[in-house]
Amino acid sequence: MNTNDFDFELPEELIAQTPLEKRDSSKLLIIDHRQKTMVDSHFDHIIDQLNPGDALVMNNTRVLPARLYGEKTDTHGHVELLLLKNTQGDQWEVLAKPAKRLKVGSQVNFGDGHLKATIIDELEHGGRIVEFSYDGIFLEVLESLGEMPLPPYIHEKLEDAERYQTVYAKENGSAAAPTAGLHFTTDLLKKIEAKGVHLVYLTLHVGLGTFRPVSVDNLDEHDMHSEFYSLSEEAAQTLRDVKQAGGRVVAVGTTSIRTLETIGSKFQGDIQADSGWTNIFIKPGYQFKVVDAFSTNFHLPKSTLVMLVSAFAGRDFVLEAYRHAVDEKYRFFSFGDAMFVN
């Protein structure tokens, strides 16, 4: 298949720049790919799509304030680092601007020298491996000096950084939020649990590759980014029990889907506790092994995320649903509305 097969017209004014006042007041487009039906609803009605005995699987990663502004120790030139992933100890892969000024051995100071970074390796596309030195606890230093890394298509400043975190965010490590989860409130989750739905959490630390456009025409040539994931034994056991009892595994967002399907592919359809790195690329032709239904936001044209949704529900039907969403003025991307896919 070709990348252009997943293109669609999206008016720029439909790209949501700010979150709604209430998390669960966003719109929800409910689609059933077998019946070929679409229903316009609101997100707090997602509870009606869940049955007692189902499992609702959420990604509990927490977004790091991963954007750092500092200056080179020798020239005092301004430098921006965006933390991508912790490679080992105090070493991180980062995206550096301007990268050409940062050679191996260069040092950068942040916050009056409370945090220092030394460049230890150069990667392509402005990537660098840096080693940090600091006093105290790294995450606390980062909280005091770093800024929330909003996606490139959001141009307005976020007044409350917690609105770019899910209410169940727990495990530090992401460069971007698992945005399908932003719609849930604590109260809505309590109601869902009271209905007899199992709430299950996994972790996938979202990298910036999630925003990287597909740069090749032939999908078979696309090099998918890697992200760290983890599923506990307790969570795996709950999911096995749900499947055995005839319940559904309902994933919240593409990051939960990619984690569950990575594990399902690795263990021949079985659900086992596991952790590691995944670069799974789910596109039409893929056979789903674990996930029975899911919620997700509306994604960028020609993105791997539109391809993932198309793998589950069929490209033509998904693009028809997207055209409907555009016609009905749904809000798109990270702070936008949601879709529930049966």
UniProtKB/Swiss-Prot annotation:
Keyword Lipid metabolism found: no
UniProt keywords, alphabetically: Cytoplasm, Queuosine biosynthesis, S-adenosyl-L-methionine, Transferase
* Main localization of the protein described in the UniProt heading: cytoplasm
Query: EC number(s) in its UniProt entry?
Result: 2.4.99.17
**Gene Ontology BP terms:** queuosine biosynthetic process; tRNA wobble guanine modification
Which pathway does the protein contribute to? tRNA modification; tRNA-queuosine biosynthesis
What's any one GO cellular component for it?
Answer: cytoplasm
The record's catalysed reaction(s) read:
7-aminomethyl-7-carbaguanosine(34) in tRNA + S-adenosyl-L-methionine = epoxyqueuosine(34) in tRNA + adenine + L-methionine + 2 H(+)
Superkingdom is Bacteria
Gene3D superfamilies in UniProt: QueA-like
InterPro entries, from UniProt? QueA (IPR003699), QueA_dom1 (IPR042118), QueA_dom2 (IPR042119), QueA_sf (IPR036100)
The record describes its quaternary structure and partners as:
Monomer.
Database matches in HAMAP family: QueA
Give the similarity note: Belongs to the QueA family.
Q: What does this protein do?
A: Transfers and isomerizes the ribose moiety from AdoMet to the 7-aminomethyl group of 7-deazaguanine (preQ1-tRNA) to give epoxyqueuosine (oQ-tRNA).
What is the name of the protein in this document? S-adenosylmethionine:tRNA ribosyltransferase-isomerase
Q: What gene does this protein come from?
A: queA
